[in-house]
């Protein structure tokens, strides 16, 4: 691609993402499917703006590379060692069982046995990028099903290496006498990377961090990711595996969080580019001429993989409620199929349209996954939200709650217990299945599901409830629920949890007057006790605490219109000085009033 063509392609990618992803989010089908649809629209079989799909697809694999580095940062070697049985046990079983079944089915459709073996192995792989993104979106990272899913994906990454080595042998082009010297050099180079990374990376990053220049640290992080990817690629190994190992080597370092911050923006953009490229690679011509074969293939592929994964999840001891999400999130074909099938095609293993049919099947299966997960969510919601005839009468008997609580973590539990102690009728909306099970045992009226969906809020009684308390961990979810309630349930008073000043400003801008910053009150209380320990009278300390709370809220409201404007930093400092002077004057006036508490803020 020439420079101008590359610039035009970049603009088209960004434009397609900006248009398609918000529309997909509004339709509730997820950002990943939005990226795929955007790729179809601008690709050679859509509007035809971009035709060089192969080059862009190869470049976009960097999104998976960055993602695997960040995953490695979250896993230290001890955690990885604990996963060894699920990686080489369940992971190996999934690839083997899925490949055998799918290869057998391909042989029934006139594939030669060599092509069927390659096709079965390729289709057995799942999309690391899509599965991990969906697991994060669904909060599966903290569940046993999510950990098992990650183990399966990691084994698939490892399995790609011998699978690629097998292709020339199946084609009859393999060497009778392998070059053991070449193999030994690759193993030695890999060992050097491990040892060098173990002992050199931390001193290098310590030296770079000592410069105090953030841009240099970001450049070093990018150099590490891209360098390890290139090194593994030169060895003929998986680029994603190389960056994953680099991440693990730094997982216990003091620079872990700084590296995550430096890499995160690049990961998001490149992952979006990857999904757009996959959408562009969809051959609509083959789809049109073989529509029945392709549709049946997608259904069979997703069904076979879900059945295998569900059975393995049951064998592993996953709870019934975690088996379906575990099976669904890995049910698609993956990006490694593109690499494997391309290698097989170069060895003349496929005939006629066989490779194109397999690639279309993989691409469409990736597009079904967000819809499959949405269906699983609805199925689980119907299961959990259905009334249990054998259950004891719950503490909350009225079908019309006074208060709806969204999220029942540590913050939400305190609110719920306080309301229950005062005989208030509450309904809890929670996405964590284990929390739903526990809450129902204690007699709470709980709905499983995503509170950003209008129908779930209606089912929970939002049309008649007096208040809703939003305690989500995700600020974006909080704002979605706030806007949804303002639009459809204006009678409800909205109370929300803010994790900090930025979220507090956003809530104020949205018109939410009742909110609580999660650390502010506890910090003020500890500050009051500190003043008392320094000799201040308890009444004065209480009054100082209340004054500070009132003045801080005033500053929060005054600075709300300019909180996103970097040019207004001087205005922030000026306002802070003004409020400190006001606080000092008020405290001076009441310095001699040692008795009596202020009633209100």
From Swiss-Prot:
Keywords of the record: Antiport, Cell inner membrane, Cell membrane, Ion transport, Membrane, Potassium, Potassium transport, Transmembrane, Transmembrane helix, Transport
Purpose: Pore-forming subunit of a potassium efflux system that confers protection against electrophiles. Catalyzes K(+)/H(+) antiport.
Protein name: Glutathione-regulated potassium-efflux system protein KefB
HAMAP family noted in UniProt: K_H_efflux_KefB
Pfam family, one: Na_H_Exchanger
GO cellular component, one term: plasma membrane
One example of a Gene Ontology biological process annotation: proton transmembrane transport
Compartments in which it is found: Cell inner membrane
Family: Belongs to the monovalent cation:proton antiporter 2 (CPA2) transporter (TC 2.A.37) family. KefB subfamily.
Annotated TM spans: 5-25, 29-49, 55-75, 87-107, 115-135, 152-172, 181-201, 207-227, 230-250, 268-288, 291-311, 324-344, 356-376
Topological relation to the membrane, as annotated: Multi-pass membrane protein
PANTHER family: K(+) EFFLUX ANTIPORTER 3, CHLOROPLASTIC (PTHR46157:SF4)
GO terms of molecular function: glutathione-regulated potassium exporter activity
Annotated ranges, domain RCK N-terminal: 400-519
InterPro entries per the UniProt record, alphabetical: Cation/H_exchanger_TM, K/H_exchanger, K_H_efflux_KefB, Na+/solute_symporter_sf, NAD(P)-bd_dom_sf, RCK_N
Domain of life: Bacteria
Encoding gene, per UniProt annotation: kefB
Subunit composition and interactions: Interacts with the regulatory subunit KefG.
